[in-house]
Regions:
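Catalytic cores of alpha/beta
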Residues: 25-36, 154-164, 206, 210-226
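Hydrophobic faces of well-ordered beta-strands that scaffold small-molecule active sites
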Residues: 14-18, 43-45, 94-98, 123-125, ...
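Glycine-rich phosphate-binding active-site loops on the catalytic face of alpha/beta enzymes
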Residues: 41-51, 120-124, 129-132, 174-180, ...
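Alpha/beta catalytic cores of nucleotide-metabolism and tRNA/nucleoside-modifying enzymes
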Residues: 194-202, 211-263
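Glycine-rich beta-to-alpha transition loops that act as phosphate-gripper elements at the mouths
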Residues: 19-24, 97-105, 129-130, 150-154, ...
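Active-site-adjacent beta->alpha loops and helix N-cap segments on the catalytic face
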Residues: 1-7, 50-61, 68-81, 104-110, ...
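N-terminal amphipathic alpha-helix/helix-capping segment at the start of soluble metabolic enzymes
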Residues: 1-17, 79-85, 262-263
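Conserved, mostly hydrophobic/aromatic
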Residues: 16, 35, 46, 115, ...
């Protein structure tokens, strides 16, 4: 199974997010393959949930659309299994972004057993307090799955505590609030990333609010990569099952921007 750190071995990483089941699970599968061809180094697959508290309207609406198609967690595992097999198997790391509730309702042991089976490298759980990470991580680690920590602008003491315990990569949240596209990112990301790097040597990628190539380049200059969600989900929302070319072009332009940052 591809490990998260592999995503950062070829220079600065571009990490797109897609909401599973939005406009149908078959389209999600095809779009992941397209994003990989366009240069994605790792893909975050969102498991739709009825109360996604960290998400802005774009991803909330995608979750609602996906749930209305009747998509279930088992369907998402089946999709990942298909992505990982065959001549055109996806080999880059794939991680789930989900909330505590879907994992607990599905059953933690069963969830992480299937993650291992289909080739999920890690999970990101935005509503999980750091203090509760151990409980989930103890089950995840049995199955070789890393639990990615999010670090938002906060005190150095808290950054130290979270960074020292981090695994896979650190998801550095560019601004407080929910996900979504922002015209400007006002947080001093450079200082936060430098602080994180005092306490860990694992990669740090920045997300929340990045939508333009110049923003991705700026963030990748001070970190190890850029994460983009809402802008990708918006392309799928606008083009439905005909988003192939628009997605390819967008991901390719964002990948080129982060590579420029590392040049």
């Amino acid at each position: 199974m591809s490990k998260i750190k592999d995503a950062f071995t070829k220079g600065k990483a571009f990490i797109p997010f897609i909401s599973a089941g939005d406009h149908g699970i078959e389209n999600t599968e095809r779009y992941i393959r397209i994003m990989v061809k366009a240069g994605a180094d790792m893909v975050e697959i969102g498991i739709p949930f009825s109360d996604p508290t960290a998400e802005g309207p774009v991803i909330q609406e995608a979750s609602t659309r996906a749930l209305s198609t009747g998509v279930k967690i088992n369907d998402i595992f089946d999709m990942v299994r298909r992505l990982r097999t065959g001549d055109d198997a996806v080999t880059i790391p794939l991680v789930f972004m989900t909330y505590l509730n879907p994992i607990y309702v599905f059953g933690r042991e069963k969830f992480f057993t299937l993650c291992e089976e289909v080739g999920i490298s890690g999970v990101i759980v935005p509503d999980m307090p750091f203090e509760e990470k151990g409980e989930l991580a103890s089950v995840a680690h049995k199955h070789g799955v890393e639990v990615v920590s999010l670090i938002a602008p906060t005190s150095e003491n808290r950054i130290e505590m979270i960074a020292k315990d981090a695994e896979g990569f650190v998801y550095c949240v560019s601004s407080l609030g929910v996900t979504g596209m922002r015209s400007k990112i006002k947080t001093d990301i450079k200082s936060i990333v430098e602080m994180i790097r005092k306490y860990t040597d694992i990669p740090v990628a920045v997300g929340f609010g990045i939508s333009k190539p110049e923003q991705a380049e700026t963030m990748a200059r001070v970190s190890d990569g850029a994460i983009v969600g809402s802008a990708i989900v918006k392309i799928v929302a606008e083009h439905g099952e005909h988003a192939d070319q628009a997605l390819f072009d967008y991901v390719q332009s964002m990948k080129q921007a982060v590579l420029k940052a590392g040049a």
